[in-house]
Amino acid sequence: MTPRPVILRRLTTGNGPRVLLLHGMADSVSIWDKPIALAPHRKALHQAEFFAAELPWRGTGPADWGYRAEPSAWLAEALDTLAAAEGPADVVVGHSFSAMLLLDLLCGPAAPDLRGIVLISPYFRARPEDFDWATMTGLPEKFVLAMEEGIRLAAGARAKPVLHRAMAERLCEFIGPYGWSRFFESYLRTPWLRTENLTAPALVVSGTGDRIAATAEAAALAERLSTATLRTVEDAGHFPMAEQPERFADLLDEFLQRPAPVRGPAGKPPHPTSLERI
């Protein structure tokens, strides 16, 4: 049986904002277990109603998800599923690949109306010149490193580092050329995202030890967004919500309690060209 592309999971109940969590490439909803376990001890998190989406690029998802040319459409489907079942999301939290796709969706013409967004370990480059050949040739190794890091965190005390590399390479094979092509395409067009269209309050979170999506990219994104705040997490890499769950829970709790900020000036994307949508 072919797995369903998008599956919605309720994580908590509450009478506060409805929050949708979106995992990254080859991950699962379990990446949110640690911060969600801390929710009862924080006012805003305790009141919030948390949902998580199992997305097609999860480790057990359908192998053909990459055949769809616009992967951000899968996030729109997750938002529509939540809206139909429980009501529209107030806040959406995206990690890694999903953070990049969420940004793409919200900068587009059919952006959902949200009260806030949280972008964790996002991929973003402000100018097309920021990409070079070394960027492209180095990304495959970064993909494997990301998979290794995720496997290590998921395994915990049961970790067998000698197996992690082989497992990570197998995951990369499972995602396949079309899946990774969707990543490349989304990443390469980040300089042209219409970030001025994004008016919701935004929290950008980056681990200072992230070897995969560097903090400099998160900082560039926060500078581009007029309503964004950048928060870095010490002693964390690409998965700050799992590596430093207490710190991440504090940041999310603080964000959910903040009033909507007044918009200020923000950076602008390059002038549009015929390559705006690659």
Q: Model-predicted segments: where are they?
A:
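Catalytic histidine-centered segment of alpha/beta-hydrolase-like enzymes
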Residues: 236-249
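Short beta-strand immediately N-terminal to the catalytic nucleophile in serine-hydrolase-like folds
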Residues: 92-94, 120
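Gly/Ala-rich beta-loop-alpha elbow adjacent to hydrolase catalytic centers
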Residues: 94-102
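Active-site loop/oxyanion-hole signature of alpha/beta-hydrolase fold enzymes
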Residues: 4, 49-91, 250
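Flexible "cap/lid" loop of the alpha/beta hydrolase fold
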Residues: 103-145
